[in-house]
Amino acid sequence: MSRPTTIAVINQKGGVGKTTTVINLAASLSIMGQNNLVIDLDPQGNATTGFGKSNSEEEKNIYNLLIKKIDIRETIQKTEIKNLDLIGSHVNLSGLEVETANDNNRAFVLKEILSAEKNGLLDNYDNLFIDCPPSLSLLTIMALVASDELLVPLQTEFFALEGITQLVKTIDRIKENLNPSLKIRGILLTMFDKRNKLSSQVDKEARNYFKEKVYQTVIQRNVRLSEAPSHGLPCVIYDKNCVGSKSYFKLAEEFMKSGSIESAA
């Protein structure tokens, strides 16, 4: 059995569809038969609540895994979706940077945990998806160090390309100093509005700049994608026939066919 691929879903800017992508891509892949584990590394815990779980769960959370070093099996929760498990966030995660200030090895803690477990329990998974905070914090660095690949959601709005250019520079610094094998799996265009010329312009510019890194699938603006988290369900379960769900099922198919691509300088 091959080891799972660890994929961080990342953008230093908030509101780009990052958590929506984690939830619905992982759910789509699981519905298609793959085994997936979502790790919610964002203190806001939106991926956790998006699966109908609490980000104040006292035992089964990523904070206890990183700080208390408890057995990873004690942190994994089943979701309502077959083949899809979760290590949820916790409100205490926001204080992690202060709590680990004296640990010179703290950037590697998550990598060491996942690397050790990939020889055992985690081998049952095809993918480990990490939902990152929308900032370049210690938690984000931990995710970048622990990951094999990155998936970058890019909203088709003004200033989007400027932000992702800065992110690519950050990725290259991480590659140079902490994780030389890190690769970009793909860039996903989100919040696309075909009625808006700006969306089409950003789409064109992104494909001109990042070439084959950009997925052919685009995620259109869709109210059902926004509604689903309040029901504690991925949209692909909440309303599998809506435009947003169909886009994520299409992305899942493309994701399974695609390989990872070296980061641009």
Task: For every predicted segment, state its role.
Residues 1-265:
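P-loop NTP-binding core
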